[in-house]
């Protein structure tokens, strides 16, 4: 058999899949056109990229400027936190003022106040009544003859007078050394009231005793009275 001849279909397929079949002139001309087209489109593309490049530079500058601001903000935050912590500690350890003065440690008046001022303030705040905080009654504020029982006085066994304790010795000496009252014995000539000692009627014919103060009693009653007392029953101060 003879050599196989290539048909037009085979040649067309070969040209379709092989780029070397293109003429060199056509290929060089196409390459030049493609290069010119690429250069024409490259310029607008590079010009369009210029704004993005400037924007990137601005972003980089902003990032560089903001980089030191973060530590500064942190340092400022720490300073603010330390200041607030100091104020909180000061308020926690502050001494309250008794008078409610302005400031954590009270006013200067409360610091420099004297003990006399404190006593005067307590006296002003004390109620005027006689309660626990009011003025108390002092024994010496009343005369002895108005309130002798406050002094722990006693009743004299001689004259039956209530005597203050500080005058007890002098009064006993005077009463014991005082001479007995003398009386005039008499017989009652008529009925005259009642005896102040026995509270019985003084009748005509009764033996009576007439004292210097002109008081009359039954003789027996006044004798018993003088055994204990040295004064008239109706005039103990004489």
UniProtKB/Swiss-Prot annotation:
Residues 35-77 have a biased composition (Low complexity). Coiled coil: none annotated. It is a peripheral membrane protein. It comes from the Eukaryota. A lipid is attached at residue 2 (N-myristoyl glycine). One of its GO terms (cellular component) is endosome membrane. One of its GO terms (biological process) is positive regulation of autophagosome-lysosome fusion. A zinc finger (RING-type) spans 195-236. Phosphorylated; leading to binding to YWHAE. Phosphorylated by MTOR at Ser-147 and dephosphorylated by PP6C. Ser-147 phosphorylation stimulates vesicle-to-cytosol translocation. It is an enzyme of class 2 (transferase). Its EC number is 2.3.2.27. Expressed primarily in the nervous system. Expression is more intense in the granular cell layer of hippocampus, Purkinje cell layer of the cerebellum and the granular cell layer of the olfactory bulb. Detected in sensory neurons but not expressed in sympatic or enteric neurons. Expressed in testis, adipose tissue, columnar epithelial cells of the gut. It is found in: Endosome membrane; Lysosome membrane; Presynaptic cell membrane; Cytoplasm. It holds the Pfam family zf-RING_2. It catalyses: S-ubiquitinyl-[E2 ubiquitin-conjugating enzyme]-L-cysteine + [acceptor protein]-L-lysine = [E2 ubiquitin-conjugating enzyme]-L-cysteine + N(6)-ubiquitinyl-[acceptor protein]-L-lysine. Residues 1-137 are annotated as: Disordered. E3 ubiquitin-protein ligase that plays a role in the establishment and maintenance of neuronal transmission and plasticity. Ubiquitinates the Na(+)/K(+) ATPase alpha-1 subunit/ATP1A1 and thereby influences its endocytosis and/or degradation. Also acts as a positive regulator of mTORC1 activation by amino acids, which functions upstream of the V-ATPase and of Rag-GTPases. In turn, phosphorylation by mTOR leads to its inhibition via targeting to the cytosol allowing a self-regulating feedback mechanism. This is E3 ubiquitin-protein ligase ZNRF2. The gene is Znrf2.
């Amino acid at each position: 058999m003879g050599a196989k001849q290539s048909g037009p279909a085979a040649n067309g397929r070969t040209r379709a899949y092989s780029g070397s079949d293109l003429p060199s002139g056509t290929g060089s001309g196409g390459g030049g056109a493609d290069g010119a087209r690429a250069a024409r489109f490259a310029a607008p593309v590079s010009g369009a990229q210029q704004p993005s490049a400037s924007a990137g530079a601005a972003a980089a500058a902003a990032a560089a400027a903001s980089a030191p601001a973060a530590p500064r903000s942190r340092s400022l935050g720490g300073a603010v936190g330390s200041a607030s912590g100091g104020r909180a500690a000061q308020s926690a350890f502050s001494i309250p003022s008794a008078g409610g003065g302005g400031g954590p440690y009270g006013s200067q008046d409360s610091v420099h106040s004297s003990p006399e001022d404190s006593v005067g303030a307590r006296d002003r705040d004390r109620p005027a009544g006689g309660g626990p905080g009011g003025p108390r009654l002092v024994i010496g504020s009343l005369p002895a003859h108005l309130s002798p029982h406050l002094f722990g006085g006693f009743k004299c066994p001689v004259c039956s007078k209530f005597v203050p304790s500080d005058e007890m010795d002098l009064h006993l000496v005077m009463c014991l050394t005082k001479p007995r009252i003398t009386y005039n014995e008499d017989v009652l000539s008529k009925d005259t009231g009642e005896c102040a000692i026995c509270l019985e009627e003084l009748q005509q014919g009764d033996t009576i005793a007439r004292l210097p103060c002109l008081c009359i009693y039954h003789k027996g009653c006044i004798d018993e009275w003088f055994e204990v007392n040295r004064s008239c029953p109706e005039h103990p101060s004489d």
